[in-house]
Structure formats: structure tokens, C-alpha cells
Amino acid sequence: EQSLTHYSEINRSFASDCLSEPVSAITVEYYQTYFLSLYDRHLSKATVSTYIRHIKIFLKWLEVEYNLDLQTKKIKVPKSPKKNPHIYTNTELQQIFALIHKDDSWLSLRNCAIVSLMLDSGLRQNEACLLKTCDVDMSRQILKVFGKGEKERFVPLGNMSRQFLQEYFAKCPYHKKYVFCSKDGSQITRNAVKLFMNKLAAQLPFEFGSHRLRHNFATNFLIDQYNEKGSMDIYALLTILGHEDVKTTERYLHIANQVIYSTSHISHLDKIMGF
């Protein structure tokens, strides 16, 4: 749903820019000028790449639907620069929860529980909003989650997350179908979660957000497996994250290996020089 909204917004903006132009004026040069203007808006390279990809899909649909030649084959989508997610240190994790858990109000405990579930169970933002009370199994420490396409999966519930949930349930004045609610008792929305995440991000000296919390879960899941078992189960992680394609999950294998190698690196020079 969010992806469709984003797609519509991008193409609505593009369409409003070229409505006054005749079809004959919509050339490769026109596209280049428009795409360059995106950089003038101070958008990141990754965002511009997303804009161009969505616009190209829209134009290809117009070509087929209205039998037009909009030269879409000449539109080159730039590759998004790949950036490894920041893996939080123990100190940074303490900073995050110290900011959220300023008091023992039910709203503070709610926010702690949401962040904890993203960080320790790998929930997406929308999955946290849609989590039902009946799908939380405290005794077995399991959550039933409905992900993209309403696909059901089970994810682990850590001790800290369980404690936050128990304290939140005990203090929340509302007892509803969904686990997390707003001040008025209604189901919490993605915008509400995004708002408090943005407020937190503004107070932290490092990158923070729901996607980064999920990335941290995935990377640390593999690192912990390696430290405990000497191997990493990519398919177990795929199941927990709700991915359909193992290639999506494999990026975390690469990141986890980087972290493991960097922390266990044996310096040849140190050995020679006696350090």
C-alpha cells in the first residue's frame, strides 16, 4: 500500500510537469532535463534512482495502453549506491532506550516495546501496527505476524521485548484487538510510529529508523549464530524476516561476514612487531 502511494506521488508530480507539453516534445532530452532537476531538490542518488525507475514503469504503461512511442528504451535507470546499514554498538543501544524510556508511562512503554520488537524480532513498521493481542504468545515467546501480502509467519519474542509488552499491557488503559494503540485508544497508525521515530532520530547522533532496526536484527541474528554455532543459517533468517527470495536475505550474510572478519582480524604486523 505504501509502495503504491509512493509510486502514485512520483508519477503525479512528473505528469503535472509535462501536461502542458505535446507528446512530440517528450523526448530523451526532456527526460534528462527533468531527471537532472531532481538532483536540484537535494534528493539522494538512491531516491533519484527510485524516481526514474517508477517514471519509466509509468511511461512504458502509457506506451502500451495508448500505442505511443515515448522512447522509454533510452531511459537509463542509474544504479542505487549500496550502503551497508549501521550496526549499533552496545552504547548506542543504551542511548536509544534511555531516550525512549524516560518515564514509566504507558506511552513510553509502548514505544519501547515497538522499538524492541523491530530490533529483536525483525518486525516491519506496518507489522508492529497490525500486531494483534491474540497473536502474542507470552509463555512460548512467539509472535504470529502478518507481513506483505497477508502472509503469516512466526517470529521469536525476546525476554526484554516480553518485559516491555507485559509492562505496557499492565499500564495501558485500553484493551483492544490490536496490541499498540494511540492516546485515544484507537489502533496506532504508521504515521504515528514514523513521527515518534523521527523525533528520536533527531535526538540521536547516529542513523536511526525502523528499517535500520530491522537491518540490525538481521545482521546480529547471523553474527550471534556464528558465535554460538560456528555457522549462519540464512534460510532461518529468511523465514523470520518474511522474505520470498533468498537473494534479499543474502545481503545480511555479506554484512555479517564483514563485521565478523573485522572484529576477529589478526594483524600480521602486530605479530611481527610484538604488539
Identify the function of each model-found stretch.
Residues 1-275:
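Conserved catalytic core of the tyrosine transesterase superfamily
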